[in-house]
Amino acid sequence: MALNDVRAIADQLLALTAGLDEDTARGDSVLPGWTRGHVITHLANFSEAMTRQVEEALQGRLIEVYDGGRPARDAAIESGAHRPAADLKTHLTQAVTTLMTSWEKVGPTDWPLPILHRNSNLAAGLQATWRELTIHTSDLNLGINPATWSEDFCLHLLDFLRPRTPDNIHLILQSPTTTWENGTGEEVELAGALTDLTAWYAGRPAPGPITGSTPELLPWP
């Protein structure tokens, strides 16, 4: 994964939402209980929050991801989701564009700088940006779905989500191109396209079929 991968998904997201109208903004996303307005608001707010992480880290400082923590984050999504489509689009465009400008400032020796997002560093923050933009672009339900996810992204996401595998299960995900395994215990093997298996593991609808009995997964880490 490189900055170019994040730039590509950011460009795709903004192109996908360029024609956003009121009906589209109020339509259902893939996420239960969330309209597209909710997803767009979350993406814009996340982009602003991550911009703060980057800018402060480059100055040698740490800052909270969201002022007020998770409750304030959730309240901001709900209050912002119902804005006019033009406002949603403007907020998203400005926030994502500003975030990408901040990422462009990061030099080769800056990536280990610490941030408070997941108590990690700028390199992990860039990966988080890749995940958030890629997954939620699919969540918008605007013609892009996990079938478009690259193999590199799928393998990264599977590894990030390893804590979702239940205890006492040896999970085997078998695709035509790769075998991914996690956990110890009773073998549970699922087969399908890598994108479908990854979508399921991420808690999203798989575009194609998966064979095998899917276990109940643990929460996101």
Where are these regions (language model features)?
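Active-site-adjacent loops and short helices of periplasmic peptidoglycan-processing enzymes
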Residues: 4, 12, 16, 20-36, ...
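Alpha-helical scaffold segments that form or flank carboxylate-/histidine-based iron centers
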Residues: 1-5, 24-46, 75-88, 114-132, ...
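Non-transmembrane alpha-helical segments in soluble domains
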Residues: 14, 40, 51, 89, ...
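Amphipathic, well-ordered alpha-helical segments in soluble domains
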Residues: 9-12, 16, 46, 95-98, ...
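Short, helix-capping/interhelical loops that line the mouth of catalytic, cofactor-
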Residues: 1, 48-98, 104, 217-221
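A structural signal for well-ordered alpha-helical segments within the folded catalytic domains
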Residues: 7, 11, 44, 48, ...
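Surface-exposed helix-capping loop/turn segments at secondary-structure junctions
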Residues: 19-25, 104-111
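Structured surface interface patches that mediate subunit assembly and partner/cofactor docking
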Residues: 2, 55-65, 105-221
